[in-house]
């Protein structure tokens, strides 16, 4: 596997050097500071106060885990959304205080979501623990789900959901992938990145907001409390691939072929 990966990296460098420069993807940070805070008094929205917090707040410099994904709005804080079992009267949050983001085909939203105290999946919602619904300027909505142990897990490696498969086993929960973005090794804390692929039909519209609804309840040990926390969010517009442009070496070979063909015709004539 290591040899194959190395070959892939080398091939990518070579192809990148020969191909015409590609347009860069556009990344827009979605500011979360207006929503920092806790859920029902149990979470205050500051990673430094959580287990392993002193190392978690170093994620801007020690994170990424070779994912190549950065979050410019990372600040060591998070937005906590409670589960219904925390009994604070609300378990959903709408974030829409950002300027509309014009979308291209293939646009994605990237996030850092993790659980607190674990969340038992809700069978009434296709076994999702968290539902996230995006809306656009045309009034359309697209719903996605995060499954505990599949695309979301507890931030603390303890007795809750500690696996991260990387995709949902339930396809009805949308095109979502997940990967580890940062961890502090044997200390046991981590932050995980999710990518939501927005509908291609949304190209030309703008992302205007989204709602997070924590439908999972309790935790894997029946402690009766749970929440999900977002540390950072970004919208990524995937750039269109550039038109193929012949390289100078290719043009030279083409010219040589044309000259040779002309000489052959003159000899036959």
What is each model feature region?
Residues 246-264:
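A short, hydrophobic C-terminal helix/tail in secreted or cell-surface proteins
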Residues 266-269:
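Short, charged juxtamembrane terminal tails flanking transmembrane helices
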Residues 1-9:
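Bacterial N-terminal signal peptides that target proteins for export
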Residues 1-2, 221, 264:
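Generic N-terminal leader/processing signal
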Residues 25-242:
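N-terminal/edge-of-domain interface segments
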Residues 8-17:
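Bacterial N-terminal signal peptides
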Residues 18-24:
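Sec/Tat signal peptide C-region and signal peptidase I cleavage site
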Residues 17, 242-244:
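Generic N-terminal simple sequence motifs
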């Amino acid at each position: 596997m290591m040899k194959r990966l190395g070959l892939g990296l080398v091939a990518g460098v070579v192809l990148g050097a020969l191909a015409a420069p590609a347009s860069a993807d556009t990344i827009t940070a979605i500011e979360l500071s207006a929503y920092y805070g806790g859920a029902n008094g149990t979470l205050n929205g500051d990673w430094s106060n959580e287990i392993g917090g002193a190392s978690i707040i170093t994620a801007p410099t020690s994170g990424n885990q070779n994912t190549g994904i950065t979050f410019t709005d990372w600040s060591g804080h998070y937005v906590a959304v409670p589960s219904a079992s925390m009994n604070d009267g609300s378990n959903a949050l709408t974030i829409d205080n950002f300027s509309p983001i014009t979308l291209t085909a293939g646009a994605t939203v990237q996030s850092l979501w993790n659980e607190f105290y674990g969340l038992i999946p809700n069978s009434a919602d296709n076994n999702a623990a968290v539902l996230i619904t995006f809306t656009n300027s045309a009034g359309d909505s697209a719903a996605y789900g995060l499954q505990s142990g599949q695309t979301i897990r507890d931030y603390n490696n303890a007795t809750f959901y500690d696996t991260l498969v990387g995709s949902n086993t339930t396809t009805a929960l949308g095109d979502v992938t997940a990967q580890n973005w940062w961890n502090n090794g044997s200390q046991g804390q981590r932050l995980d990145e999710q990518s939501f692929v927005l509908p291609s039909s949304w190209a030309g519209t703008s992302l205007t907001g989204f709602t997070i609804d924590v439908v999972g309840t309790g935790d894997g040990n029946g402690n009766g409390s749970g929440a999900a926390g977002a540390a950072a969010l970004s919208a990524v517009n995937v750039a269109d691939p550039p038109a193929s442009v012949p390289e100078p070496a290719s043009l030279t070979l083409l010219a040589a072929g044309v000259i040779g063909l002309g000489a052959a015709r003159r000899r036959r004539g």
